[in-house]
């Protein structure tokens, strides 16, 4: 049973050798293997974004930097690997093998059904186009005013996620750039088809890191239950197949928790520094990693930190700061538009970090210490109050809030069509945040959500009552992000888009809380007269936690959004040729120019721009003349757009037909929707100009 150590640290049972002789004959490969894979992931992200920011991205530059960083970090993990490689008992070895099998199966299955999000409509297309830019141009400053589009009069270059800060200046890609740099590495190695499968690999690594930390928090079998439940969750499956950065964030975060717990157990400051690198890299991966970091910094400073954690916390904070330096350069130098869009998010966070520092400084004064001691005398009533608040607030959020509140915010979102389709009153300022707890229930199942709520409350109670700072980073991150995103997800509320808010921290964190409670209750029931019915009930709950997500995931097992688009873009590039320049028309009733200008520019490596339909023939001919040794093509969806234009015969560049998961607001997405995309091209030639007059 978990117990409090002399320092008040909550401890759990560790896998033990099956016999004394086993230790001499059989060293565990689990910990070294996990370390190797996670070190490769961390250093891949850091090397990729560093080389991209330097403007020299290519395999020839990324691989040596990646290798050097990986070797350095691998050497730094040697004490942790040596201390944690004792052989485990047979059942634990089987469970660990199963955890590896789950991770590998996730890579293989989700890699077989990649979502080819290559149009710049939403974040996935921006990420893949940024990766294409890196492959074709080698840097993050995107010079678009090149011949024949160096005279920008009447021309536009921006797209969803791509913006300029000054006229005729470079385009900046939104978001943090570690994830697209990792996709670009894959694309350089194996092409566009492999690029869109990168997240399947990152999803497998995330599952492995999640299990590894879960094994330390709960029993191995319970961690495996949580891993299976996560792997089968539709939110995890969907975003493992789609090119979004949440999976990278999830893997780095739980790798950091895992490494930090080893550092605490082994009193190892070097391992703590490496753990900090992982935790800080959540900001390298995503801007909202800053919220996670705020919770972790809070956990690593007084009054929360104490005992063994206090000895390694400075090293962990130093490691996190190292990663944050890289992230801050990426954010402020290479994503200035992203900063402008999120000032209202960044300023409160900055104030939060300052307040955390001031609180820590105040606690270390004599009056601060006295105040902490006075509060700690009531830690058990405080723990009881916190646990009760979690349960009551959770029930309220799930049962009551959706019935009594309609949440709105100051801006409007393009959701009116969806509201009409679902028979709702059109109100495009609705956030649907009042339903956010039920969103979790859709994908996790109510049994998992109920057990997770109780486990969350139980873990908080034990950690506060026993002053168990060992789990404070995990609990504060899970608690803070869950409360934040249940209260206000701050995202366009269509599904499954909005549900990615819960993926890096909330869903996995709650599943581990459920795993901890299952393991604890199982051991409490062992040896009691009523252990058979108790174990039977727990077995049923365990089965429901694993299997209920299949109600959502099962019918969509072979979901593959936008299938074939990668190959069709490669064919389009071949049809246009390396000596092409393309000008896309902004046609009424279509967004093809908005969705395809940057993807074609990035993946074909040719100059691209778009323009309004009012562009004159004289301007078209002038652009064709400026093209010099390139052929200027006018691109449109409607053949009528070429009438009266100085162009030759048009031909099909791209004809794409595929499916997407439906968008919903008040019900979970279950159906598939068909869509099509046609791109026609015609060469601009003076001989084809209509007669004057």
Task: List each language-model region with its residue ranges.
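Transmembrane-helix signature of polytopic, membrane-embedded enzymes
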Residues: 193-194, 210-232, 251, 264-274, ...
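Membrane-interface transmembrane helices that cradle and orient dolichyl/undecaprenyl
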Residues: 256-271, 302-309
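Transmembrane-helix motifs of polytopic, lipid-linked glycan transferases
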Residues: 70-79, 194-217, 255
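Transmembrane alpha-helical segments
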Residues: 104-112, 289, 487-488, 517, ...
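Membrane-embedded, hydrophobic transmembrane alpha-helices
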Residues: 1-97, 306-455, 621-624, 647-651, ...
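Short acidic/glycine- and proline-prone juxtamembrane loop motifs at membrane-interface regions
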Residues: 235-248
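Membrane-interface alpha helices of multi-pass inner-membrane proteins
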Residues: 52, 213, 226-227, 271-286, ...
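Interfacial juxtamembrane loops and adjacent helix segments
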Residues: 132-187
């Amino acid at each position: 049973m978990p117990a409090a150590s002399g320092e008040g640290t909550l401890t759990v049972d560790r896998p033990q050798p099956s016999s004394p002789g086993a230790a001499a004959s059989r060293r565990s490969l689990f910990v070294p293997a996990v370390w190797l894979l996670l070190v490769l992931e961390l250093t891949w992200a850091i090397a990729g974004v560093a080389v991209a920011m330097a403007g020299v991205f290519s395999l020839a530059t990324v691989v040596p930097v990646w290798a050097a960083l990986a070797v350095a970090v691998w050497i730094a993990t040697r004490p942790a690997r040596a201390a944690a490689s004792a052989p485990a008992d047979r059942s634990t070895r089987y469970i660990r093998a199963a955890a590896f099998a789950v991770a590998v199966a996730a890579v293989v299955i989700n890699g077989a059904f990649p979502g080819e999000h290559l149009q710049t409509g939403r974040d996935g297309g921006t990420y893949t186009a940024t990766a294409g830019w890196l492959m074709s141009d080698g840097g993050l400053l995107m010079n678009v005013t090149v011949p024949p589009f160096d005279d920008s009069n009447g021309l536009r270059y921006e797209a969803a996620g791509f913006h300029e800060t000054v006229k005729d200046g470079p385009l900046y890609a939104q978001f943090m750039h570690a994830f697209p740099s990792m996709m670009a590495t894959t694309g350089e190695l194996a092409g566009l088809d492999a690029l869109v499968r990168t997240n399947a690999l990152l999803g497998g690594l995330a599952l492995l890191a999640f299990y590894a930390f879960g094994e330390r928090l709960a029993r191995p079998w319970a961690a495996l239950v949580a891993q299976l439940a996560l792997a089968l969750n539709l939110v995890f499956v969907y975003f493992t197949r789609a090119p979004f950065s949440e999976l990278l964030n999830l893997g780095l975060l739980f790798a950091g928790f895992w490494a930090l717990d080893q550092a605490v157990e082994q009193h190892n400051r070097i391992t703590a520094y490496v753990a900090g690198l992982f935790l800080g890299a959540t900001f390298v991966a995503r801007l909202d990693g800053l919220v996670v970091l705020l919770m972790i910094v809070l956990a690593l400073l007084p009054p929360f930190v104490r005992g063994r954690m206090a000895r390694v916390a400075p090293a962990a904070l130093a490691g996190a700061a190292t990663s944050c330096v890289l992230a801050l350069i990426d954010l402020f130098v290479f994503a200035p538009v992203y900063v402008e869009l999120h000032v209202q998010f960044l300023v409160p966070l900055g104030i939060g970090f300052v307040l955390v520092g001031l609180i820590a400084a105040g606690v270390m004064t004599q009056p601060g210490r006295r105040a902490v001691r006075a509060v700690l005398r009531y830690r058990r009533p405080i723990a009881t109050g916190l646990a009760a608040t979690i349960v009551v607030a959770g029930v309220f959020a799930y049962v009551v809030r959706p019935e009594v509140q309609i949440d709105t915010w100051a801006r409007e979102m393009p959701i009116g069509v969806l509201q009409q389709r679902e028979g709702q009153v059109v109100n495009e300022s609705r956030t649907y945040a009042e339903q956010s707890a039920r969103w979790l229930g859709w994908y996790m199942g109510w049994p998992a959500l109920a057990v997770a709520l109780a486990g969350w409350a139980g873990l908080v109670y034990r950690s506060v009552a026993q002053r168990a700072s060992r789990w404070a980073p995990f609990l504060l991150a899970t608690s803070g992000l869950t409360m934040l995103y249940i209260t206000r997800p701050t995202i366009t509320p269509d599904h499954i888009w909005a549900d990615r808010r819960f993926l890096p921290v909330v869903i996995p964190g709650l599943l581990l809380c459920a795993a901890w409670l299952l393991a604890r209750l199982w051991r409490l029931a062992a040896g009691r007269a009523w252990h058979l019915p108790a174990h039977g009930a727990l077995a049923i709950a365990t089965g429901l936690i694993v299997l209920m997500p299949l109600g959502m995931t099962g019918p969509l097992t072979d979901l593959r959004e936008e299938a074939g688009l990668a190959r069709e873009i490669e064919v389009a590039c071949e049809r246009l040729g390396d000596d092409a320049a393309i000008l896309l028309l902004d046609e009424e009733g279509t967004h093809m120019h908005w969705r395809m200008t940057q993807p074609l520019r990035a993946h074909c490596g040719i100059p691209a721009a778009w323009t309004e339909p009012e562009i004159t023939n004289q301007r078209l001919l002038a652009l064709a003349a400026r093209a010099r040794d390139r052929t200027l093509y006018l691109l449109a969806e409607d053949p009528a757009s070429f009438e009266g234009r100085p162009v030759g015969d048009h031909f099909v560049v791209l004809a794409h037909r595929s499916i997407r998961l439906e968008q919903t607001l008040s019900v979970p997405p279950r159906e598939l929707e068909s869509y099509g995309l046609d791109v026609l091209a015609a060469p601009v030639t003076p001989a084809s100009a209509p007669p004057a007059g």
